[in-house]
Regions:
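Short, conserved loop/helix-junction motifs that constitute active-site signature segments
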Residues: 3-4, 87-96
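Glycine-rich adenosine-cofactor-binding loop
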Residues: 5-25
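Hydrophobic Val/Ile/Leu positions in short beta-strands of Rossmann-like dinucleotide-binding domains
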Residues: 10-11, 34, 100
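Conserved S-adenosyl-L-methionine
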Residues: 26-31, 116-120
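NAD(P)-binding Rossmann-fold cofactor-contacting core
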Residues: 29-52
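Short acidic low-complexity segments
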Residues: 54-68
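Short glycine-/small-residue-rich Rossmann-like dinucleotide-binding loops
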Residues: 75-78, 102-103
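Rossmann-fold NAD(P)-binding glycine/threonine-rich loop
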Residues: 94-148, 152
Length: 157
């Protein structure tokens, strides 16, 4: 999915959520909603992003996913069975692209519910597959591609 000119919501603005938000801003996202249970984290992240991307439209303090092209769960919600959903699923459009950073299970309850609504989804382990080649290159180790890692992976949910 090309992010240029699109809208996105990132739920969870810690380290992973901050990196995702910065990547989205760098990719040309037009509108970005930041939500964290600690609103100060969202506002500090927004201030840092605004310094580098002054035309980025930012929103805070709501985890209402209505009207976003992209929705990312960057919280630990979904690591344990019975965790609450990060957003109200009734408000997620079937046209929304939904990603989750949780690695513990390939298809979290959140992703399963969004997929059942017709959303295109991206599992958390895909994030890891994209990071591994960069780590290997950084440490001057023999590298591979994210696609090759996907081919070799034996993921059990």
């Amino acid at each position: 999915m090309s992010q240029k000119g699109k809208s996105a919501m990132v739920v969870g603005n810690g380290g992973v959520g901050s990196a995702i938000a910065a990547s989205l801003a760098a990719a040309g996202i037009a509108r970005l909603a930041l939500f964290d249970v600690n609103e100060e984290s969202s506002r500090k992240l927004g201030a840092r992003l605004q310094e580098h991307y002054p035309n980025l439209q930012l929103e805070y303090a709501s985890n209402d996913p209505t009207g976003f092209d992209l929705l990312v769960n960057a919280t630990p919600m979904g690591m344990k069975e019975g965790d609450p959903m990060p957003v109200d699923l009734d408000k997620v459009s079937s046209q929304t692209f939904v990603g989750d950073v949780v690695l513990k299970s390939e298809l979290t309850a959140f992703l399963q519910a969004c997929q059942a609504k017709g959303c295109t989804i991206q599992v958390g382990v895909d994030m890891l597959f994209e990071q591994i080649p960069v780590y290997l290159e950084y440490f001057n180790l023999p590298t591979t591609t994210a696609q090759r890692l996907r081919e070799l992976a034996d993921i059990r949910c």
